């Protein structure tokens, strides 16, 4: 997650902001996947280190973390555009003011919502396919919260 993960994602994000350059969807996905996707992925993987999960399930959890992390960041972009500052506890539309590239700016609000929902559904599908029953209910709740939050 270091120089080829979160750090690289943050660097690319800062550079695009400094250059005030427009990014395409692939660029946005790369930046957000490296930043928030890798952060959530690492958190999920650290949480399972002491488990007895086999390698296949560990890979599935890694994929879950990456997808739900990306969904979280997309939804964060959406909230910056549509949220209520009194609920969020921070000013809205700060991404626009700071010339940040966001999913909403690149592909619009409707498509951003669609992609975030799709990633959340894929994430939950990964968990369901692991066959671990109730032991993953907290992760499923986390995934649902990440894209249904209002702050």
Go through each PLM region and give its residues.
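All-alpha prenyltransferase/terpene-synthase fold signal
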Residues: 1-151
């Amino acid at each position: 997650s270091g120089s080829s993960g979160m750090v690289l994602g943050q660097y690319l994000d800062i550079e695009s902001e400094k250059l005030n350059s427009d990014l395409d969807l692939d660029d946005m996905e790369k930046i957000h996947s490296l930043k928030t996707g890798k952060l959530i992925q690492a958190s999920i993987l650290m949480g399972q280190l002491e488990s007895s999960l086999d390698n296949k399930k560990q890979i599935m959890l890694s994929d879950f973390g990456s997808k739900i992390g990306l969904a979280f960041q997309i939804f964060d972009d959406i909230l910056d555009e549509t949220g209520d500052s009194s609920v969020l506890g921070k000013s809205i539309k700060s991404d626009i003011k700071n010339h940040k590239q966001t999913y909403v700016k690149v592909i619009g609000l409707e498509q951003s919502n669609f992609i975030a929902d799709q990633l959340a559904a894929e994430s939950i599908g990964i968990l369901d396919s692991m066959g671990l029953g109730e032991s993953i209910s907290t992760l499923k709740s986390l995934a649902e919260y990440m894209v249904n939050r209002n702050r």
